[in-house]
Amino acid sequence: TLFRSRKNGPYPYVKGAADEDKYNRSLSEICEEVDVNNMDMFISIHSNAASEGSNTNYPVYIYRGTDTEDYAPGSKAMATTNWKHHWESVLDPQSYYGIDKPNIRGDISFYGSSSTRHGTKGDYTGYLGVLKHGVPGFLLEGYFHTYQPSRHRALNQDWCRQEGIRVARGVCEYFGLKPETKGYIMGTVKDLHEKIVHSLYHYVPKTDDQWLPINGAKVNLLKDGTVVKTYQVDNNYNGIFVFNDLQPGKYTFQVEKEGYKPLFGDDDITVEVKANETSYAQLHVEATNYVPPVVLYHNYDEPAIDGMTLAPTQLEFAQESATLTLEG
């Protein structure tokens, strides 16, 4: 595996610094290197963008060519195999598409135009510069960073690593490689009652993203009542925790955080780990100072209505006649 999108630049990255350009490489340089090394697959991973703060969020796989023809043969099949492994909608709400409804496009059809790069090993027509080479593969927009809760999740390296693991599972299936024998758990821990309210945290209503992530919580993973792993949640308002390299079986959780009660009720859950899969958990804890809403008034029963005020069940009509005298 070769990583091609960056040189070894400084860390942390400082925009406008004198060594800023050490991070970036020209797309043509990347394409030439891919061709020269005769790679089996090329993947370029990104995040997508819509309007800031919008609820749009879904992945898109893009290969060089049209919707009906991949110009680097095998690219569309690679993307199609990868899609079902990458799809994740438990912790990251998706606004469209589905595990059985993929979003896989040829770049020329998707963007509506193309150009040709004349390389040392051939001419390559497409739209995306990073795909203008002869190696099959795709560009992946994994999520929308303009969906603000997803952006907060992406601040957690373990969440990002899980995206890479899901992509790797698709690669293994495509090439018929041996799958992993262990599994993973990824989850979130959030407040049971308090919603997050912030101008930079616009979430999809009625999803788990509405609840306040518990910064700094400690999540213990238990197997047969014994703590086997511990995860320290970061302070980036995502509530993410990840447990790696787990033997298949059933696991439970403990959450420790000052000002919060232990897990109870529906949140004291058991999760089953399976080989070569990631299992998901959404945990919620109640604050120790939580006070249930006070009932300010009661809905009293309707008073009994006297029978005389009820609507009649029968009406009787009688016709009367009269003689009137007209004057004049």
Question: Which functions belong to the PLM regions below?
Answer:
Residues 183-192, 283, 293-294:
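A short, amphipathic beta-strand motif
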Residues 239, 249-259:
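A short, solvent-exposed beta-strand micro-motif common in secreted/extracellular proteins
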Residues 44-52, 62-63, 98-179:
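Active-site-adjacent mobile loop/cap segments within catalytic or ligand-binding domains
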Residues 288-328:
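Periplasmic peptidoglycan-binding/tethering modules of Gram-negative envelope proteins
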Residues 1-57, 61-73:
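Catalytic-core regions of hydrolytic enzymes
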Residues 208-215, 222-240:
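Short, acidic Ser/Thr/Gly-rich low-complexity loop/linker segments typical of extracellular
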Residues 258-290:
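Structured interaction patches on ligand/partner-binding surfaces of diverse proteins
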Residues 180, 188-214, 299-302:
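Structural motif
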